[in-house]
Amino acid sequence: MIQAQNVCKEFDGTGVLRGVSITYLPGQANLIIGKSGSGKTVMLKILAGLLQPDSGTLLFEGQDISTLTHRERIAIQRQTGMLFQGGALFDSMTVEQNVMFPLQLHTHQRDRAARLRAAECLERVDLPKAGHLYPSDLSGGMRKRVAIARAIALEPKYLFCDEPNSGLDPQTSLLIDRLIHGITHEFGITTVVNTHDMNSVLEIGDQVTFLYEGRAEWSGTGQEVLTANNQLLESFVFATPLAQRLRAHM
């Protein structure tokens, strides 16, 4: 479980996060939505340890990370998987080598053990025969699946996904959504997804938090988003074509 309590962050004197408090539960896909500039990417980076908050508290399994030693923080980082917006694969490495990379970096596994684990992860994302290929050989959706395989290689307790459907067609986006959701539930991972995709909200939103101008304005399930009694959320949600079509049939 991850708890953010009154988290604040400023850039050049401008408040980007203004007292955000959210609890993220294991085994759930926790989505952050909001307009550009709402603070959702900054919030995700703070949760993932890529940025430090100016004030507020972050608790991982009840432990305040600001009180942890360097070694204890490294231990949490090793339990964390990150799925970057572009996939961030190493083009000079094969698919297998990409998935093996965090294993060799953090656990110093021998090649045989790392290859076996990489094969398991590629099997889980339905790419069992792609290990010898290079990222340039892959479609956008396949690259995202390889990135997911790499993110789960260390069997993380926490998974942070930044716009995982960016640049994908609707059918591939649905596949990625269901893959993330399935892995989250299967392994009991605390997953946080930053997205603007309403399909994702409705498909996998176990918990959805709506940020507006750096504040957490609303929280509920993906299905509750469409009927929420919140004018700010409503103006954001029903500006999307999908939500407009759904509202027409409600």
Feature-to-residue mapping (PLM):
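Helix-to-loop junction immediately C-terminal to a conserved catalytic motif
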Residues: A48
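Conserved ABC transporter NBD signature motif
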Residues: G56-D64
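Conserved ABC ATPase "signature" region
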Residues: D64, D111-K129
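Conserved ABC ATPase signature
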Residues: Y134-L138, M142
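A short, proline-enriched helix->beta-strand linker immediately N-terminal to the Walker B motif
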Residues: A153-K157
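Catalytic Walker B motif of ABC-type/P-loop ATPase nucleotide-binding domains
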Residues: L159-D162
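Helix N-cap at the start of a conserved alpha-helix in ABC-type nucleotide-binding domains
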Residues: P170-T172
